[in-house]
Swiss-Prot record:
Compositionally biased intervals (Polar residues): 219-232
Stated name of the protein: Golgi-associated RAB2B interactor protein 3
Biological process (GO), any one: single fertilization
A Pfam family annotated for this UniProt entry: GARIL_Rab2_bd
């Protein structure tokens, strides 16, 4: 009897004893449930004999809240949350049990003793033992007292609380509290997992794994978990498991990894610094202008050019940012140096100086920080006196050097703009260099690890001499305005009355000579072969067509060296015949052929500066297009014999289009 009393007392005090000094004592400080009592008496699972447990009965439902019937019976399930060892701060195992099948004999026996008040004892069958690191418990519906269980395989179950008649009313509130303990908010999760202590360390199975697994239903695809290899819990190790380590350990990041992440931002900062130094050089040059005397205006112009170079440097900085992001070198040190320079400027550390030289027209502005920061900024503009030509140069630069431990870095940004008489050059670049010395414990012969990142952008604009000169007149206007085009160029001569008389006389002579030559050519047409006819007819037709157009307009083409060649032609055409003339265009061609002219050439250049200017404003692609037209009219006279003459007119027209294209990097 004493032993029986001791057993009953220990059995009743079992939950209180195991939940003493437990973190969730308020939840587990309850009386024994059916499953816990069965595990305590059965002895099959000694690990759960004195383990604190919290259990309740549920019915399985669908996601919509409908009851799932199996063989016209409600499917009951007992859910138990247990801890395999009192040392653990939180429970780590979930047990699932269902009512066991009653034997037929036991059922028959129950029919006979139905009215006598003797009921068969209800037994449970333990079906599942799941570590809580692979289960995510959440509240599905608070009003209907429904829970949601999601396993690591992706399957999801919905359970509705089905308490007994003698259960407490706030039973579901305890389940909500337990869910909160197992799945704390994200802030608590981070603070508990990253800063574990001996008393309040949180097992990572219930914090981080839940964030890795997604939401899904029963048919969702199984999702892998990084902790699947740790499926064995304290339940299988007899509760003798060491405390878990931190959820996320902070690993040291090398300088190269940090540089790869911030290379774009650092290069952009260098470009912005160069752009800021560019406009600053403009006011400095303007201030030094009055002191420079005659070079003051040129210095102001150079200051504006420096501002333009600064804007170009900003564009180059963006390009350098993209190049730096892909290079993955130590550009982060350049950003650190830029921040140090900004702090030094805010503290009043940097020193500024401006120097002006009146004779050379040079303005220089420097900014240097304290020796500890190692940041230097430079802006300079240089112009030559007006008598020596239009030459202007502007340069903006910034250099930084930093050394932290065994790492040393150098960063430099430079922008320059040079303007000459016919060439305008804008350059911008950024360079970053980092070197890491080998560790002290490493090999002494190892060379330091160095990295270099360079970004460069530039544009060149060439001004052709034709832009300064007036545009040459068109060929159609040369005749009326009296232009004489030679190989060297074109010049305008005044038409006098004597020249007009000479032209009239020449026209009359040409008409008379053409009539005579046409008569002789008709008599000599039978001497030529059919092959020569087919070969010459096309060229003669083209010449005759142009002659008609010129005659219809009333303008005759002017050609040099007319006097000497005209008399020779008149003396010869009377005795020689014409070859290969078609009957249709014979009369007009003969009139045209008798006009003997010299070489005519027109070289016309039409630049399109608008396309180049707009591209320069964009800072992208500079395109200079030149259209070159070459028209050559050649009339040659060749003598073969005394009785025959070969005369032909060759007209060649060539069009050349030259495109100079420069693309920025």
């Amino acid at each position: 009897m004493p032993g029986m009393k001791r057993t009953m007392s220990s059995e009743c005090l079992l939950p209180y004893y195991t939940a003493h000094s437990y973190r969730s004592m308020g939840v587990f400080n309850t009386s024994m449930g059916n499953l816990q009592r069965q595990l305590y008496k059965g002895g099959e699972y000694d690990i759960f004999k004195y383990a604190p447990m919290f259990e309740s009965d549920f019915i399985q439902i669908s996601k919509r809240g409908e009851v799932i019937d199996v063989h016209n019976r409600v499917r009951m399930v007992t859910v138990c949350i247990a801890s395999t060892s009192p040392v653990l701060p939180l429970p780590d195992v979930m047990l699932l049990a269902r009512p066991a099948k009653v034997c037929e004999e036991h059922a028959r026996r129950a029919r006979f003793i139905k009215g006598k008040g003797c009921k068969p004892s209800k037994t449970l069958e333990l079906t599942r033992l799941l570590p809580l690191k692979f289960v995510k418990i959440s509240v599905h519906d608070h009003e209907k007292q429904q829970l949601r269980l999601k396993l690591a395989t992706g399957r999801t179950f919905y359970l509705q609380l089905c308490p007994s008649s003698d259960a407490r009313e706030d039973l579901f509130c305890y389940w909500e509290k337990l869910v909160y303990l197992l799945r704390p908010p994200m802030t608590n999760c981070i603070s508990n997992s990253t800063l574990p202590t001996g008393e309040t360390s949180v097992d990572t199975k219930s914090t981080l794994v839940s964030e890795i697994r997604g939401e899904g239903d029963q048919n969702s695809r199984p999702q892998s978990s990084p902790t699947v290899s740790e499926a064995t819990s304290a339940a299988f190790a007899g509760g003798e498991r060491t405390q878990p380590a931190a959820a996320a350990a902070v690993t040291p990041v090398s300088a190269k990894a940090r540089a790869a992440g911030t290379a774009g931002a650092a290069a952009g900062t260098a470009g912005a610094a160069a752009g800021t130094a560019g406009p600053a050089a403009g006011p400095a040059a303007g201030t030094a202008g009055p002191a420079a005397g005659t070079a003051g205006a040129a210095a102001g112009t150079a200051g504006a050019a420096a501002g333009t170079a600064g804007a170009t440097a900003g564009t180059a900085g963006a390009t350098a940012g993209m190049a730096g992001a892909t290079a993955g070198t130590a550009a982060e040190t350049a950003g650190t140096a830029a921040e140090t320079a900004g702090a030094a400027r805010a503290a009043g550390g940097p020193m500024a100086a401006a120097v002006a030289a009146p004779s050379a027209g040079m303005t220089k502005a420097e900014t240097a920080t304290s020796p500890t920061s190692g940041v230097i900024s430079l802006a300079a503009t240089t112009t030559k006196p007006p008598g020596s030509g239009q030459v202007a140069a502007a340069m903006i630069g910034s250099a930084a050097k930093d050394q932290v431990g065994g790492e040393s870095s150098k960063a430099m940004a430079l922008a320059a703009n040079i303007t000459l008489e016919n060439v305008d050059v804008a350059l911008a670049g950024a360079a970053n260099s980092i070197s890491e010395s080998p560790p002290a414990g490493g090999d002494a012969s190892g060379s330091p690890d160095t990295g270099l990142n360079v970004a460069f952008a530039g544009s060149i604009k060439t001004k052709s001499p034709a832009e300064d000169k007036p545009e040459a007149p068109l060929v159609s206007t040369l005749q009326s305005e009296g232009y004489m085009c030679e190989r060297d160029g074109s010049q305008k001569v005044s038409q006098t009355s004597s020249e007009a008389k000479e032209k009239r006389e020449r026209r009359e002579k040409d008409r008379t000579s053409s009539r005579k030559s046409s008569h002789h050519r008709r008599t000599g047409m039978s001497r030529h072969s059919s092959k020569d006819k087919s070969r010459k007819t096309s060229s003669y037709r083209s010449v005759s067509g142009k002659t008609r157009e010129d005659k219809g307009k009333g303008h005759g083409r002017l050609r040099g060296k007319r006097h000497s060649s005209s008399h020779k032609s008149e003396s010869r055409t009377g005795h020689k015949t014409r070859k290969n003339r078609s009957p249709a265009g014979l009369g007009s061609v003969s009139k045209r052929a008798t006009k003997i002219t010299s070489f005519f050439r027109s070289f016309l250049v039409r630049p399109t500066p608008k396309a180049g200017d707009t591209s320069c404003d964009r800072g992208g692609v500079d395109i200079v297009t030149k259209l070159v037209e070459k028209k050559q009219d050649i009339e040659a006279v060749m003598e073969k014999s005394k009785d025959s003459e070969f005369k032909d007119t060759v007209i060649s027209e060539t069009m050349e289009k030259i495109i100079l294209e420069t693309k920025s990097i």
